[in-house]
Amino acid sequence: MKKAYPVINSVECKACERCIIACPRKVLQMSSKINERGYHYVEYRGEGCNGCGNCYYTCPEINAIEVHIERCEDGNTDG
């Protein structure tokens, strides 16, 4: 099975929460910490991402979130 996970740039995140709402697996949460721009930012809960990309596509900030999907040993991303 492929392992997917979001990578969040805490400096670029503006706490709009669109990614949290868009995530069907509810694996994102708002951090209690504040970034250098004065916003709380989104954090990954650590497991459960299915790699759907909803968070990436709904985020208005270009560099705030990416979804990484690890490749299998044969180089494919299908489990």
From Swiss-Prot:
Highest rank taxon of the organism: Archaea
Residue ranges annotated for the 4Fe-4S ferredoxin-type domain, each copy included: 4-33, 40-70
EC numbers, comma separated: 1.2.7.7
InterPro entries: 4Fe4S_Fe-S-bd (IPR017896), 4Fe4S_Fe_S_CS (IPR017900)
MF term (GO), any: metal ion binding
Coiled-coil intervals: none
Reactions performed catalytically: 3-methyl-2-oxobutanoate + 2 oxidized [2Fe-2S]-[ferredoxin] + CoA = 2-methylpropanoyl-CoA + 2 reduced [2Fe-2S]-[ferredoxin] + CO2 + H(+)
Keywords recorded for this protein, A-Z: 4Fe-4S, Electron transport, Iron, Iron-sulfur, Metal-binding, Oxidoreductase, Repeat, Transport
Cofactor note: Binds 2 [4Fe-4S] clusters.
Protein name: Ketoisovalerate oxidoreductase subunit VorC
Organism of provenance: Methanothermobacter thermautotrophicus (strain ATCC 29096 / DSM 1053 / JCM 10044 / NBRC 100330 / Delta H)
